[in-house]
Every structure is written in C-alpha cells, then in structure tokens.
C-alpha cells in the first residue's frame, strides 16, 4: 500500500510513501533508479555475488537501474521513495560497477564555490556537498549537502527534490504565507516550478534526491 505525492508519467518520475508486509523478490535487474528513506522496519538487498546489504529505519539508500539484485524483507517496512523510470532507457556505461549506494551523514564533503550574491538575502553561506549517484541520463542525482545559515528570496525551483533533514532545521515557504518548518528526522518534497524560499538560522545537513530535467541541466550549464 502507499500514497503518491507526485507522479509525472511523461518524465517517468514519481515520489511517495510505501508500506509492505514481508516478502522476498526474485533476483533480476532493477528496472528503475530509486532513492529510498526507510521510516519503519528494514530490508536486505542481495546482489548477484551473494553480498547482502541491510538498510534499517532512519537510513537511506539508492538502487541504481540495472543492478542485478533481490529484495529480502522479513518485517513490515515503510519508506519514502523517489523513482525515476527513464523513458529513454539511457545506456548504462558499466553495469558491472553498479552497487547499492548508502549515503552517510558523516561522509567527507567538498566546498561549493558560490559566486552569485543575488541568490541570497544577506551574507552568502558556506556550503559543502558530496555526490553519491548520477544516473545514466544525468538527470537523477543523490547526495549529501550542508550549509551555514542563509536566507534565499522566493523563486520557482529549477528541480524536483526530496530532502531528508539530518541536522538543524529550515523553514520552507512559498512566499505567500505558507511556511513549514522541517527539522532533523523530517523529509520535505518540493516539485519543480513551485515557489520556493529557504530560511535557516543554523547549520543544516541533509540528504537530497534531485531530478533536474535535461533541458534545465543544459540551461544551467549554459548560464554558468
């Protein structure tokens, strides 16, 4: 059972919450790219070579499209998910290198070089990022991000993003009086094109799963 918060069939992108009783799937190539954040229970992913990876409540993981694996679930499980079912079936360069990806909030991060003060109200923050996964189409990406406090003006967001807050808190707003506070342990979903304003007064760390359509990626690259 589950509930979809977002479903764009043309893009092949959907996000929601999913609950399932125990089951064991068949070994086979995973048909989609999927980011998952486990809310309750656990699951073990077994790959072709017999390696088993168990993911439990509070943890996140990625199964890349094409990974040959088996889903083994011995208890009830509830998760948030983002699925990208690439309509173009972009060629996977090296299927043998695919693996279950486990983002870790303690992983090393690289400083983001911010160059445009107009993106912020007041001082530019210090931000860091660690990218874990970019799909074969270069549109679906998962990573770890952190930032010192900052305030950003409201504007339409150029991507669809599910964020899982690991540390700190942030107020997300549409600029029209609809403010929501998200703190460590919370998740927020923002669809592309939504009016989006970020205000944080403390250090924030999050996992992100972003889908940035190819045309937006190209425009962003051209703008840089």
Predicted segments, located by residue:
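A short, N-terminal "cap"/entry segment at the start of jelly-roll beta-barrel domains
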Residues: 1-12, 87-139, 224
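Conserved short histidine dyad/triad with adjacent acidic residue
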Residues: 2-5, 11-30, 65, 128-131, ...
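Conserved hydrophobic/aromatic beta-strand scaffold that supports enzyme active sites
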Residues: 15-17, 35, 60-62, 142-144, ...
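Short, flexible domain-boundary/linker segments around small modular repeats
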Residues: 16-20, 43-48, 143, 147, ...
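Short hydrophobic/aromatic-rich beta-strand segments that constitute the beta-sheet cores
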Residues: 27, 45, 79-81, 154, ...
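Short, conserved beta-strand element in jelly-roll/cupin
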Residues: 29-45, 156-172
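Short acidic-glycine-tyrosine-enriched beta hairpin
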Residues: 49-65, 176-192
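Ligand-binding loop in jelly-roll beta-barrel domains
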Residues: 65-89, 192-216
């Amino acid at each position: 059972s589950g509930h979809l918060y977002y479903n764009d069939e043309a893009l092949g992108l959907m996000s929601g919450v999913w609950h399932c009783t125990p089951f064991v799937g068949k070994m086979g190539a995973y048909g989609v790219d999927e980011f998952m954040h486990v809310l309750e229970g656990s699951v073990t992913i077994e790959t072709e070579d017999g390696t088993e990876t168990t993911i439990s409540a509070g943890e996140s993981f990625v199964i890349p499209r094409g990974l040959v694996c088996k889903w083994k679930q011995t208890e009830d499980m509830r998760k948030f998910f983002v699925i990208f079912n690439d309509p173009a079936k972009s060629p996977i360069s090296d299927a043998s290198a695919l693996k279950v990806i486990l983002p870790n909030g303690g992983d090393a991060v690289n400083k983001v070089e911010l160059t445009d003060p107009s993106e912020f109200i007041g001082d530019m923050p210090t931000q860091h990022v660690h990218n874990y996964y970019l799909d074969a189409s270069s549109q679906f990406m998962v990573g770890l991000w952190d930032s010192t406090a900052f305030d950003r003006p409201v504007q339409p967001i150029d991507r669809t993003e599910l964020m899982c807050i690991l540390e700190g808190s942030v107020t997300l707003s549409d600029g029209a009086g609809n403010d929501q506070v998200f703190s460590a342990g919370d998740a927020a979903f923002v669809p592309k094109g939504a009016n989006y304003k970020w205000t944080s007064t403390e250090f924030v760390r999050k996992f992100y799963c972003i889908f940035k359509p190819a045309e937006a990626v190209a425009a962003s690259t051209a703008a840089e």
